[in-house]
């Protein structure tokens, strides 16, 4: 095949073909657009410092009542009755037997009011150990809120003073609200906005926001874009990494076309960003190669020699979240060669929309979450960065406390877990919700909006703001201007250390992270 002399029509054909071939790498759409990556960040990481946030998104809506399970006798008995359990604290319906929860009982430093107690799902023994050893915390009853809200205000009609989050109970919209504070269609997330501020702290800005689970609005910023990577490594651009149509000559021709300067602005921009994407893939591949080659060897804690040993457990076989977190650990190990001082990662686990088969389905999910997250935490210890890497869970929404027979339905508020040595661990944060599903004027019925769907007493903005402050985002106003934190989380101003009409306090910083 003769390809060394190409007229303009042929060049266009090859360029179009190279676009089609390149886009077979799923990461390319977000990898290619590197525009504005050199924008100055609003904060600068101190020399030698490193911090990373890892968002673990549980797609489908995590069942709060069987994840962080109420344990004190009065609350447990109410839970057991509502969820179809038997008498005398035995299992039944979709309730756990109390005896099954004893090994995962959480022992906080500060007891909860009214002697409330919680245990984690029986499969979460590793996370129980992390909590009881001060390496994890539980934030109670979080969900999207625009302003502090009571049940009376929720049921009322004054949406000017008490606006509701849009499209409650909808998967796509609530996923987007959690990740961006806006419903489906939002283009910018709070993880990406943190990345915007951190760009100039990193010498290679493209590695600021990295997803190991495909595209998400969470990592999209105004300037920062999500670099997508697979669990096997950087996604190669096919037409320049291997022969095309079995021909090395075609590959060479396309490579030349992609590197030539063009007079047409779109062709030239395509060449520039594709060349940068090729370079980025090469950097990622070489940076993680050493650790990847030596996985599980020995027991030393230097990168690449036993560092990733926790991920070799047979218990992690087939665990997609573990594979994602293993890649995150490899990237963190390569942080110096990637020029990174601040990074935000996004991983996920699906299968939480359990309208039926809740007990079996959630057992699989919680086993995978427990095993993956504990392996990842231990790997950060091995890397010497456990106090510099914070992982946290998020999900579409919580679910109903009532059973629909074999599962639970879409809800609102939920409980979430934060892990890392920078966490003020062995504590519960927020307000423990009453265990009730009835609709009366009793105080116990004021914090659900029907069937035990929790009305959040902590907003996602407070949760995000606490994480962002530790990450280095400035929470303070300068010369009367809006603070960095309020810029990326506009609704946070509505939770600025205020006491709601219910008497519940909404702190700007929830306190579960150490000072930055």
Residue ranges and their predicted role:
Residues 373, 380-405:
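Metal-dependent active-site segment of extracytoplasmic phospho-/sulfohydrolases and closely related
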